[in-house]
Structure formats: C-alpha cells, structure tokens
C-alpha cells in the first residue's frame, strides 16, 4: 500500500504540468527514503528539467539508497535535456518504481533496462491506467501518429445549437463557459472551421481571468500558454483582420491551396489534399501528429463536427446541455449526411456526467 500512496502523490504532482508541458508528457516523481519523502517534482515545461531532476535536486544526498516513484519510464536519450536514467544512477537510487513504460520509440523500455543494468531494482505497471489517463494525447500520438481529439458541443435539451437566425450566445451558462476555458488551457491546440470564424469571429484563446480559482492557483497568469489555433479554411475565406489571427500565440491554417494575403509571422499554412471534394481530415490529423500536436480541442459548427465523427477521428465527446428548449427550427447538433442505418451510427459510451452550474456536462468516449 505504501507504493500506491507514493505513486498517487507522483501522479498528483504530474497533473500540475498539464497546462504547460506540450509536446512533452506530464510526469511526476517522488523520492522516498526510510518512509519519508525527501524529494519530489514534476515536469513543468518542454526544454526544462524533467520531474526526476527536480526531485533529485530536492533530495540531495538523501537520494542515495532511496526509492524513486515516477509516473513514466525515465528517459534514456539525449534530447533537449540529459537522460534522467543517468541522473538516477549517479544519485545512487536503489529502487525505481515506474507507473508505465514510455511508448516513445527513443525510450520504449531502454530506460528501465539501463537502470537494471546499473544494479537498480526496477518495476513498472503500478497504477498504469491512471498514468495513461494523464497523458492520453502524448500516448496516442506516440502509438498511432495521430493527436487525441476532443469534440466539444453545446446544446439545448432538444439537441439544438443555435436559433434559426443563427443566434447562439449564450445557450449554456457562464459556469459552462468557464469549464470550457479550463479544457482549452489543457489542450495543445484548438481546431475550428472557417465557417465558425466567419459567423462568430471568435478569439479562441484561454482567458486566465475566466478560469476557476482552483485552476488559477495551479496555473499562474505569468505561465499562460495559448494553445495553437487551427482553422480549416479550404476556400481561403478567413482574412488577416479576423480576431483569431490577432490574438497572442500561433494560428495555423489548413488549406487546399496557397493564399496570397499578407499574414503576421505567427501564422502558418498547412497544405492538405482534398478527398471527395473536401479537405482530407485524416491527412490533416497525420500532419498535425508529425508537428508534435498531442491533443486537439474542437470548437466548430455542425458540419465539421459531423465530418470528424464520420471519419472516426473523435476520441472524446464533451457535450454541455442547457436546460432549455429551442424548437424544431433551430440548428442541429451535427451534420451526418448519408446515415441511414442504426448500425452505421457513431457509437460512444458515457464516461462521466456532472453538473456545471445549471447545465449538465456529458463526457463520452468511443465505444
């Protein structure tokens, strides 16, 4: 039970990095000697010291003969920082307990093997499912090459997202919108469509002042990182004057053809081929994976939402339901053309249902 206690502490530490570590995984480390925590730390930002290094610095000489609990296999390769395996070996750690192996091909068991070769007692698999939940995006990208996609939808009780006139602000509550801010902050990128940009002119930024107090305490304003904003714009309809381009951070456009407009340096273009007359979403996701995008939060209209669902690209559905009815003339939740049989319907299963102010948030994953 002691091992579980210390690993749970390491997992809790790892969660603190979930806003800032992209494209790296979230990792926590706790060093224990004679039943006392002598060092702990978590990975805070890509390019900065890993969790093990922070914990070893805190432990100092007490690390010798101690047990290190780490939520992911210690790295064994030279990247932007030196290998954590070398640091653990040099510190004289006697035992390493890892929650899981690292699927990164540059590590993939080599770290644990190196520790064993140095005479360290090594085990892995403790609280592995919890560790995997912590790094869903990183793990999916490493295993498949694709980012982890969360599709956010907001609707009325009768599944409507806007009035017939297009009016949609606001169907859901201020509490739900604060929850969306937290979800944005945890995501590596936010995806939308040119139709949404033209209709709503959104900023699609993380607004620190709108985060809940608990998130603000974990995520100081000076550390604020804006997710990459990605716009699917196959007809080059978005202009440099739109708000999404004017915000801090990067904006990427997925296009099927070059655009001749003058864009700020923070704008990038990804040229993606067409498939059946539309931008190929599968190729786009492959390209984003190659760009080291771990997780994508989608905020878009019914057309893009439906296209992602029909392409089988959605890993999670996050649906905010407001306790109001908009009527049959209002706009529907998503467009799924050609769907005629129940057997062909995209299937999900409920993972969590929670109250968010007066609304309900449905959290679903692929069946």
Segments (PLM) and residue ranges:
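Flexible, gly/pro- and Lys/Arg-enriched active-site loops
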Residues: 310-348
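Conserved histidine-centered catalytic loops in small-molecule metabolism enzymes
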Residues: 337-367
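Zn2+-dependent cytidine deaminase-like catalytic core
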Residues: 31-130, 309
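Short gly/pro/ser/thr-enriched loop/turn and capping motifs at secondary-structure boundaries
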Residues: 103-106, 129-130, 198, 237-239, ...
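Short, basic/aromatic recognition patches
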Residues: 2-22, 141
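Residue-level signal for inorganic ion chemistry
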Residues: 10, 28, 75, 115, ...
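Active-site ligand-binding patch in enzyme domains
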Residues: 140, 150-157, 161-294, 303-306
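Short beta-strand scaffold segments in enzyme catalytic cores
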Residues: 27-35, 153-154, 362
């Amino acid at each position: 039970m002691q091992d579980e206690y210390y690993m749970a502490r390491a997992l809790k530490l790892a969660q603190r990095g979930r806003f800032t570590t992209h494209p790296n995984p979230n990792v926590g480390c706790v060093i224990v000697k004679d039943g006392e925590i002598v060092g702990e730390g978590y990975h805070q930002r890509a390019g900065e010291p890993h969790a093990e290094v922070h914990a070893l610095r805190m432990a100092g000489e007490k690390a010798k003969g101690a047990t290190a609990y780490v939520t992911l296999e210690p790295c064994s390769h030279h990247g932007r920082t030196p290998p954590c395996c070398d640091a653990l070996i040099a510190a004289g750690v006697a035992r390493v307990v890892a929650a899981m192996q690292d699927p990164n091909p540059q590590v993939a068991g080599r770290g644990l093997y190196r520790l064993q070769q140095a005479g360290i007692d090594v085990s892995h698999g403790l609280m592995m499912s919890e560790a995997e939940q912590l790094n869903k995006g990183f793990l999916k990208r490493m295993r498949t090459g694709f980012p982890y996609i969360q599709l956010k939808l907001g609707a009325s009780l009768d599944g409507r997202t806007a009035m017939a006139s297009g009016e949609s602000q606001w169907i859901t509550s201020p509490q739900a919108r604060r929850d969306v801010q937290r979800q944005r902050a945890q995501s590596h990128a936010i995806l939308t469509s040119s139709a949404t940009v033209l209709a709503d002119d959104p900023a699609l930024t993380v607004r620190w002042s709108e985060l809940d107090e608990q998130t603000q305490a974990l995520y100081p304003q000076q550390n604020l990182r804006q997710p990459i904003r990605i716009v699917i714009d196959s007809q080059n309809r978005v202009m440099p004057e739109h708000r999404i381009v004017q915000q801090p951070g990067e904006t990427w456009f997925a296009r099927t053809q070059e655009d001749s407009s003058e864009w700020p340096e923070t704008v990038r273009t990804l040229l993606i081929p067409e498939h059946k007359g539309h931008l190929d979403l599968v190729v786009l996701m492959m390209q984003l994976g190659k760009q080291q995008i771990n997780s994508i939060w989608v905020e878009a209209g019914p057309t893009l939402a439906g296209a992602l669902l029909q392409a089988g690209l959605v890993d999670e559905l996050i649906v905010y339901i407001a306790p109001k009815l908009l009527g049959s003339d209002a706009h529907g939740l998503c467009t799924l053309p050609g769907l005629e049989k129940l057997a062909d319907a995209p299937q999900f299963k409920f993972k969590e249902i929670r109250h968010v102010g007066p609304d309900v948030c449905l959290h679903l994953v692929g069946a």
